[in-house]
């Protein structure tokens, strides 16, 4: 199967919820993918295929998953490509010494943290999460990775809300598996 064939089948499994979590957003729930072992495997296979095509000569040392939906498929994908998995968590959830950064989410600020010893200097990293919206949380993860001295190869997402232009805030190329909402509802 090609990446596009995987994407078509995965997209058909999504549930849609108009105006959730706020007016103008068509929420496309990708959780039904995890109810089917076959679809979950196709999600992993599609990302694995993309990474092999995008980085044929580069070893990916770590996948960095964002709390919390990046944790749903990030570890499985890391295992499939022979990479480590490192979580980015909200403040106060990781033991030991951490690096932290503050980012803006719509009308409030939040803090992300990573353990200082989680990624060695010079490591190659791919950031994984479910949806690219405003780019705030993914950009914050990128800031943490740079604080640790690693190189971000790419940000990968299941889906993107194109109209929010989140990819413009990110420090590396972006790959989105499924086509998401291109404009706000009602536009």
UniProtKB/Swiss-Prot annotation:
Keywords: Cytoplasm, Glycosyltransferase, Magnesium, Metal-binding, Nucleus, Purine salvage, Transferase. Its EC number is 2.4.2.7. It holds the Pfam family Pribosyltran. AMP binds at residues 133-137. One of its GO terms (cellular component) is nucleus. It is found in: Cytoplasm; Nucleus. Its cofactor is Mg(2+). Pathway: Purine metabolism; AMP biosynthesis via salvage pathway; AMP from adenine: step 1/1. GO terms for molecular function: adenine binding; adenine phosphoribosyltransferase activity; AMP binding; metal ion binding. It is an enzyme of class 2 (transferase). It catalyses: AMP + diphosphate = 5-phospho-alpha-D-ribose 1-diphosphate + adenine. GO terms for biological process: adenine salvage; AMP salvage; purine ribonucleoside salvage. The keyword Lyase does not apply. The keyword Cytoplasm applies. Homodimer. Belongs to the purine/pyrimidine phosphoribosyltransferase family. Catalyzes a salvage reaction resulting in the formation of AMP, that is energically less costly than de novo synthesis. This is Adenine phosphoribosyltransferase. The gene is APT1.
